[in-house]
């Protein structure tokens, strides 16, 4: 799977499905489930590394986890899901040169075929233009952008007409800068529908309603493995509870059923 294949899926009216992975086991699960693409998201900072936000994860950690994810794929390379890697905080906000180096490192040293970054400020658009001209496929991300949590929080975005018009303008700018797809997170469904109507590239929703070209979810949320569930991504199973109960069953089975005989001294 390549970035151009996602565009063809939009053109053919086929819904795109993207799930996150953070190690070889989670990658094997989402590949077996049939996801079109796998995102090694900076959410692994919270899911795998125990941080409270996505901000602390480093480029080297993203590279490490992307390699681990790639080892979990069982299919031949041409049949594997599209592998996308998040550019972590401060790997692209400090200029195009640093961004090219960061994205180039990920694509050179891992099997990732694309990177994702957040925002559409003038500086970010310049970075995207540079990356695309260097041959690096880029997925955009608007709405709730976790790397801006200290400024925007985790609340729903673009709820008033002015901010909705701004987001639509940003989405068009991202397409013009060369993005092959756009993630819209936690925005009104009517806005996502209009963005989808205006763009030729796929619009992938998470908390943006059903009228998108595809959907993306954090796998740990769907499996019920996280302590706090996002309101737009309810768990499909009580995974944490099931796993704890299974482990407790094993631990209980190790308790001796009879009292051992008293120890005999060696003297």
Swiss-Prot record:
Which cofactor does the UniProt annotation name? Mg(2+)
Q: Which residues bind 3-methyl-2-oxobutanoate?
A: 42-43, 86, 116
InterPro entries in the cross-refs: Pantoate_hydroxy_MeTrfase, Pyrv/PenolPyrv_kinase-like_dom, Pyrv_kinase-like_dom_sf
Give the subcellular location: Cytoplasm
Instruction: Please indicate which superkingdom the organism of origin belongs to.
Output: Bacteria
EC annotation from Swiss-Prot or TrEMBL: 2.1.2.11
Report whether Metal-binding shows up as a keyword of the record. Answer: yes
Q: How does it assemble?
A: Homodecamer; pentamer of dimers.
The protein in question is named 3-methyl-2-oxobutanoate hydroxymethyltransferase
* Species in which this protein is naturally found: Parasynechococcus marenigrum (strain WH8102)
